[in-house]
Amino acid sequence: MEAVKQNGLALEYAPARFLGDRGIVLEAVQKNGLMLKHAQEPLKRDFAIVLAAVKQDGGALKYAPCSLQCSFKIVFEAAKHDGQALEFASAELRANRSIVLEVAMNLRGLGASCALSYAAAELMDDPEIIMEAIIKHNRSALIYASHRPKSDLNFIIEAIELDLFAFEFASAELRDNSDIPLMA
Protein backbone atom coordinates (compact mmCIF):
# COMPACT_ATOMS: atom_id res chain seq x y z
CA MET A 1 0.00 0.00 0.00
CA GLU A 2 2.85 2.39 0.81
CA ALA A 3 4.40 1.90 -2.63
CA VAL A 4 1.05 2.70 -4.29
CA LYS A 5 0.63 5.79 -2.09
CA GLN A 6 3.97 7.06 -3.36
CA ASN A 7 3.46 6.08 -6.97
CA GLY A 8 0.29 4.72 -8.55
CA LEU A 9 2.39 2.90 -11.14
CA ALA A 10 3.42 0.45 -8.42
CA LEU A 11 0.09 -1.32 -8.93
CA GLU A 12 1.38 -2.63 -12.25
CA TYR A 13 3.99 -4.68 -10.39
CA ALA A 14 1.90 -5.61 -7.36
CA PRO A 15 1.04 -9.23 -6.53
CA ALA A 16 -2.37 -10.40 -7.80
CA ARG A 17 -3.93 -10.28 -4.33
CA PHE A 18 -3.44 -6.49 -4.25
CA LEU A 19 -5.14 -6.04 -7.62
CA GLY A 20 -8.40 -7.07 -5.98
CA ASP A 21 -8.01 -4.87 -2.91
CA ARG A 22 -10.43 -1.95 -3.27
CA GLY A 23 -8.42 0.43 -1.08
CA ILE A 24 -5.15 -0.23 -2.87
CA VAL A 25 -6.68 0.03 -6.34
CA LEU A 26 -8.54 3.23 -5.43
CA GLU A 27 -5.30 4.76 -4.13
CA ALA A 28 -3.48 3.74 -7.32
CA VAL A 29 -6.07 5.11 -9.77
CA GLN A 30 -6.21 8.39 -7.87
CA LYS A 31 -2.49 8.75 -8.59
CA ASN A 32 -2.56 7.29 -12.10
CA GLY A 33 -5.95 6.60 -13.66
CA LEU A 34 -4.50 4.24 -16.24
CA MET A 35 -3.75 1.75 -13.47
CA LEU A 36 -7.40 0.75 -13.80
CA LYS A 37 -6.04 -1.58 -16.48
CA HIS A 38 -4.43 -3.76 -13.80
CA ALA A 39 -7.37 -3.96 -11.40
CA GLN A 40 -9.26 -7.22 -11.11
CA GLU A 41 -12.52 -7.32 -13.06
CA PRO A 42 -14.90 -6.74 -10.13
CA LEU A 43 -13.07 -3.50 -9.31
CA LYS A 44 -13.16 -2.37 -12.94
CA ARG A 45 -16.96 -2.47 -12.57
CA ASP A 46 -16.87 -0.40 -9.37
CA PHE A 47 -18.39 3.00 -10.19
CA ALA A 48 -16.34 4.92 -7.60
CA ILE A 49 -13.06 3.39 -8.73
CA VAL A 50 -13.73 4.07 -12.40
CA LEU A 51 -14.87 7.62 -11.61
CA ALA A 52 -11.66 8.26 -9.65
CA ALA A 53 -9.62 6.81 -12.52
CA VAL A 54 -11.21 8.96 -15.25
CA LYS A 55 -10.98 12.08 -13.09
CA GLN A 56 -7.24 11.51 -12.89
CA ASP A 57 -6.85 10.47 -16.56
CA GLY A 58 -9.78 10.45 -18.96
CA GLY A 59 -8.03 7.79 -21.01
CA ALA A 60 -8.79 5.30 -18.23
CA LEU A 61 -12.26 5.03 -19.79
CA LYS A 62 -10.64 2.57 -22.18
CA TYR A 63 -10.34 0.04 -19.33
CA ALA A 64 -13.85 0.49 -17.99
CA PRO A 65 -16.51 -2.09 -18.86
CA CYS A 66 -19.18 -1.21 -21.44
CA SER A 67 -21.70 -0.72 -18.66
CA LEU A 68 -19.67 2.23 -17.34
CA GLN A 69 -18.74 3.52 -20.80
CA CYS A 70 -22.51 4.12 -21.03
CA SER A 71 -22.61 6.16 -17.81
CA PHE A 72 -23.15 9.86 -18.45
CA LYS A 73 -21.29 10.86 -15.28
CA ILE A 74 -18.28 8.65 -16.00
CA VAL A 75 -18.00 9.72 -19.65
CA PHE A 76 -18.58 13.41 -18.85
CA GLU A 77 -15.74 13.36 -16.29
CA ALA A 78 -13.46 11.47 -18.68
CA ALA A 79 -14.23 13.95 -21.49
CA LYS A 80 -13.51 16.91 -19.19
CA HIS A 81 -10.01 15.60 -18.58
CA ASP A 82 -9.25 14.06 -21.97
CA GLY A 83 -11.42 14.68 -25.00
CA GLN A 84 -9.97 11.67 -26.74
CA ALA A 85 -11.69 9.50 -24.13
CA LEU A 86 -14.75 10.04 -26.31
CA GLU A 87 -13.38 7.20 -28.44
CA PHE A 88 -14.30 4.74 -25.67
CA ALA A 89 -17.72 6.16 -24.83
CA SER A 90 -20.89 4.43 -25.94
CA ALA A 91 -22.34 5.53 -29.30
CA GLU A 92 -25.23 7.12 -27.43
CA LEU A 93 -22.90 9.31 -25.37
CA ARG A 94 -20.75 10.21 -28.39
CA ALA A 95 -24.00 11.69 -29.71
CA ASN A 96 -24.72 13.55 -26.45
CA ARG A 97 -24.48 17.28 -27.10
CA SER A 98 -23.49 18.14 -23.50
CA ILE A 99 -20.57 15.73 -23.56
CA VAL A 100 -19.31 16.77 -27.00
CA LEU A 101 -19.63 20.45 -26.09
CA GLU A 102 -17.58 19.72 -22.95
CA VAL A 103 -14.93 18.10 -25.17
CA ALA A 104 -14.93 21.15 -27.47
CA MET A 105 -14.60 23.52 -24.52
CA ASN A 106 -11.67 21.63 -23.01
CA LEU A 107 -9.52 20.91 -26.04
CA ARG A 108 -5.84 21.36 -25.37
CA GLY A 109 -2.55 20.07 -26.62
CA LEU A 110 -1.32 18.97 -30.00
CA GLY A 111 -3.85 16.95 -31.92
CA ALA A 112 -6.57 17.75 -29.39
CA SER A 113 -9.11 18.65 -32.03
CA CYS A 114 -8.99 15.06 -33.32
CA ALA A 115 -11.06 14.21 -30.22
CA LEU A 116 -13.97 15.62 -32.20
CA SER A 117 -13.52 12.84 -34.74
CA TYR A 118 -15.13 10.50 -32.18
CA ALA A 119 -18.26 12.62 -31.84
CA ALA A 120 -21.42 11.62 -33.66
CA ALA A 121 -21.54 13.07 -37.17
CA GLU A 122 -24.74 15.01 -36.52
CA LEU A 123 -22.99 17.01 -33.79
CA MET A 124 -20.32 18.12 -36.24
CA ASP A 125 -23.15 20.02 -37.90
CA ASP A 126 -23.61 22.09 -34.72
CA PRO A 127 -22.02 25.53 -35.19
CA GLU A 128 -21.76 26.16 -31.43
CA ILE A 129 -19.69 23.03 -30.87
CA ILE A 130 -17.38 23.75 -33.80
CA MET A 131 -16.95 27.43 -32.88
CA GLU A 132 -16.21 26.53 -29.25
CA ALA A 133 -13.52 24.14 -30.47
CA ILE A 134 -12.02 26.85 -32.69
CA ILE A 135 -12.02 29.31 -29.78
CA LYS A 136 -10.45 26.85 -27.34
CA HIS A 137 -8.07 25.12 -29.68
CA ASN A 138 -7.58 26.32 -33.22
CA ARG A 139 -8.82 26.25 -36.77
CA SER A 140 -8.01 22.57 -37.19
CA ALA A 141 -11.26 21.79 -35.37
CA LEU A 142 -12.95 22.73 -38.65
CA ILE A 143 -11.55 19.56 -40.20
CA TYR A 144 -14.21 17.60 -38.33
CA ALA A 145 -17.08 19.96 -39.09
CA SER A 146 -19.73 18.82 -41.50
CA HIS A 147 -20.22 20.59 -44.82
CA ARG A 148 -22.95 22.87 -43.44
CA PRO A 149 -20.81 25.05 -41.12
CA LYS A 150 -17.96 25.02 -43.64
CA SER A 151 -20.38 26.43 -46.23
CA ASP A 152 -21.99 29.03 -43.97
CA LEU A 153 -20.58 32.43 -44.92
CA ASN A 154 -21.31 34.05 -41.53
CA PHE A 155 -19.84 31.10 -39.64
CA ILE A 156 -16.64 31.13 -41.72
CA ILE A 157 -16.25 34.89 -41.32
CA GLU A 158 -16.58 34.48 -37.54
CA ALA A 159 -14.01 31.66 -37.63
CA ILE A 160 -11.62 33.78 -39.71
CA GLU A 161 -11.95 36.61 -37.18
CA LEU A 162 -10.60 34.16 -34.59
CA ASP A 163 -7.98 32.61 -36.84
CA LEU A 164 -7.31 33.85 -40.36
CA PHE A 165 -6.10 30.42 -41.41
CA ALA A 166 -9.55 28.94 -40.69
CA PHE A 167 -10.32 29.96 -44.27
CA GLU A 168 -8.37 26.94 -45.53
CA PHE A 169 -11.09 24.66 -44.08
CA ALA A 170 -14.02 26.53 -45.61
CA SER A 171 -15.99 24.80 -48.35
CA ALA A 172 -14.55 24.96 -51.87
CA GLU A 173 -17.31 27.37 -52.88
CA LEU A 174 -16.34 29.83 -50.15
CA ARG A 175 -12.60 29.39 -50.74
CA ASP A 176 -13.21 30.41 -54.36
CA ASN A 177 -14.47 33.77 -53.08
CA SER A 178 -11.27 35.72 -52.48
CA ASP A 179 -13.20 38.57 -50.84
CA ILE A 180 -14.11 36.55 -47.75
CA PRO A 181 -10.82 37.02 -45.86
CA LEU A 182 -11.21 40.76 -46.46
CA MET A 183 -14.71 40.70 -44.94
CA ALA A 184 -13.43 39.32 -41.65
Residue ranges and their predicted role:
Residues M1-A184:
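Non-catalytic tandem-repeat scaffold regions and their flanking low-complexity/translocation tails
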